């Protein structure tokens, strides 16, 4: 095996591990349950938002210079600061607490159902705090064992669930399986994570000797394809298994309960225990890694006025308080955050993907601004704000019934921003010419 192929495989598996979080396992089966016999359309929706778009995040950052700063510079010189701050707050208040909640409900309570929730949650974040404080390399070594372990267990579940399905998918009368799964894919948070991990990931590629843009981009693309296939097998398989349970489990079954119920029917109690242990340990390593990264970021943001260890403790205390709400409540209360951040992130991604063909910086500014406005409006409605005018206005926008109300505003913002920027540039040029003439 030549060096390029070997490195592509190694980096591709590493990228798969970065995106493949134990906390995300609960989403595909639930989407399959909702889609029923329309599971294939749901797989396509999840493929785009939960797999393809996050991986494109890494590719686009590589192709636009290798950093989120360069990707977002056309929007505003300091836009990336606010954008990264928003993502970091998401990790602090959503992703990290969710790992604790999933570890408790799918890990500890799956084996010991009578244990009070507060006990494993406090223990989980105490361990997180201990290891994150030390920045121990032991966690990296454990992670290298746990990711393959979890992957093997899931592969067994997926293969068994596909080869000997528990039942046939039934009709569920879901109107828009593609868009439901597409929007459901927001909950993985992987696109937001891709903007955070891209620099580290790309630095590793350069460290391996791929220093030119062409070489770096080639390895990135190869690795992305490998990661995409791995995620498609796992997420697609879990979604299909959820669909096979659509005639057994009632709609609205809680996500953790559904996944544990499916695994019990496929592999019995042994499968549940194996999955619970792997998920518990994988959630722990994810929590430690995220806590360390977020604490580092806030420590730098404070110019070292507040210590790294203090931020670790703050994050863990917040993690305990939010994790005690439970997985379902965390998902419910964080939905508005995704409704705002994800459309903006997708627009930034698409602008970066086609950056060579973008007429001017006004296109970036207009597209992102219009997307932000409509996304905030939709988020307000999603949390129960009563506004007949706002609701009627959004319902008039094409694709709003499918959850894509931001597409047309983004296009209009792109066009209007481009025209305004062009006119301003023309006016400046004319003024400059007059001054030179005078």
Residue ranges of predicted features:
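Hydrophobic, small-residue-rich membrane helices and short re-entrant helix-turn-helix hairpins
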Residues: 134-145, 177-181, 201-230, 247-260, ...
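A generic transmembrane alpha-helix motif of multi-pass inner-membrane proteins
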Residues: 157, 164, 361-438
